[in-house]
Amino acid sequence: MKFQKAVITGLVFILLLWIPGMAFAGGSSYKADTKYPIVLAHGMGASAEILGIVDYWWGIPGALRDEGATVYITSVNGMDSTRNKANAFKTQFLQIKAVTGAAKLNIIGHSHGTVYTRDAISNLGLYPYVASHSSIAGPHRGSAVADVVVGIVPNSLEWLVGDTLDFIYAFLFGDTNPNSLQNGYDMTRPYMINTFNPNTPNKSGVYYQSWAARIKTMAVNARNWYFIATWPILLYHEGANDGLVSVTSAQWGNFRGTEDASWYSAGCDHLNIVDQLFGYTPGFDAGTFYVDLAADLKARGY
C-alpha cells in the first residue's frame, strides 16, 4: 500500500511539472491574446451603444475576449468634428493605458473611428503609446456621399439642418454639444485629401493596416436595402464600395484586402463589417474576422 501511494504521489508530481511545461513550450492556447490591449473606436452617427440599446460592435468584443484578448470600448460623440472626437478619444485612451499599465495599446477603428484616431495619434501626441492602428472601412480619402449631402443643403439652410441634427443626437444619443454639420464637412473628399491627410502623417513606430468592405449586388428586397441610395452614388464617383466608403478610400498603410463575404452573398456592407445588423450577415462571420485580425497582431508582436 505504501509503495502504491508513493507511485501515485510520484506520478502526480511529474504531471504537475509536465503540464505547465507543455503549456509553456506550446505557447498560449488563445488566438487573440495580444501583447498589448485592444481599444475599439466606433464611427460616425453612433456611440458605443446605438440608441443606448444596441452594442455598436455587437458580438465582436465577446469573440475577442473568448480568445484571450483584453478589449476596451471607447465612446465619443456620434456627430462632431474630427478634432473634438480625437480629443475625447485621447482622454479615454490615456485612462485605459493608466488602468492597464500597458506601455502601448492596439487601436481598431471603424469608419470615422479610423480617422479621429489617426488625428489623436499624429496631432495630439498619442503615437508613443500606440503599437498598431487597424482601420476597418475608413474614409481616409473622404466619401462622395458626404460631398453630395453637404452639396445639396443650401447655405441658407445649413444652420437649420445642423441644429436639427444636433438636437436629435443630443436628445437620442446623449451627445455633448455635437456638431453634425462639421462632421459632414470633415468627411468630404476635398477636406480629407487636401487638408486632413497632408497634416496627419503616419508616425514611425506605429504599424498601420487597413481593410475595406464591398457590396456586390443591390436590390430593393436585398438585406442591404438601407444603402440603396448611397451605393450607386459611390459606385459612380469612386467605384466598388460598402455603401458609405469606397474600397479605394478605405486603403491606408498596409492594405490587407477587401471583405465581400462568400460568393453566394450580396457582399459585406459598412455595417456588416462591425457585425450589424444584429450579428447576421450571410457568408461573413465578424467574430472570426476580428479574432483573426488580433491573432495576426499577436504574431507580429503587438
Enumerate the language-model features and the residues they cover.
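Active-site catalytic motif of lipid deacylating hydrolases and related acyltransferases
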Residues: 29-105
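Short aromatic-enriched loop/helix-cap "lid" or pocket-rim segments at secondary-structure transitions
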Residues: 52, 144-149, 219-225
